Amino acid sequence: MCFITFFGYCALELTSSLWASSYLVQARGVSAEVASGCASLFYIGLTLGRAINGFLAMRFNDRFLIRLGLGIIFVGILLVFVPYHAMFAYIGFVIIGLGCAPVYPCIIHMTPDLFGKEKSQAIIGVQIAFAYTGFCTMPPLFGLIANYVSISLLPAFLLVLLVLIIAMHEKLVRLKTNQ
């Protein structure tokens, strides 16, 4: 479950960042110059979020921060879905980046608590392998979907990944809490 969570998270992060500008141009009619600038805002959200997360981590636990991040991603995806003005999508991608910020570091940080310090190094290695598998497979898969179906499906694709992440993370937390 933790491996699928990592796979889904990294797939969501990279698919969001790689396909944002194409989505804005092809689905929202934004100029390429504006779209590329707005897509880079995803990374501003991610960077800002990581800085904020560093301070929040002193006060809140990893589970809370992961859930908070996933909730923020959900809000961002909902904004990308809003069809009225491209500004909603711009803001949505920034918010998705902001929400992504705590997830990766907090999952890594909570691994020793979930699996024990003696197993955590091996578990983190496998988590990273699944993370890179998500990085390498899902953005090209969305490329096929965009090419053969519609690039307008980007928010739905991201939502499916988010549901997968939430389901796997919550199931893992429940299992470990009950042990």
Task: Report residues per predicted region.
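Extracytoplasmic gate region of multi-pass secondary transporters
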Residues: 1-40, 47
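Transmembrane alpha-helical cores of Major Facilitator Superfamily
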Residues: 7, 40-44, 71, 125-133
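Intracellular juxtamembrane helix-capping segments at the cytosolic ends
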Residues: 102-115
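Structural signature of the two symmetry-related core transmembrane helices
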Residues: 64-78
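Helix-to-loop junctions at the C-terminal end of transmembrane segments
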Residues: 49-61, 146-147
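Multi-pass alpha-helical transporter architecture, strongest
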Residues: 157-179
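Paired small-residue
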Residues: 76, 87-95
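A late C-terminal transmembrane helix in Major Facilitator Superfamily
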Residues: 117-151
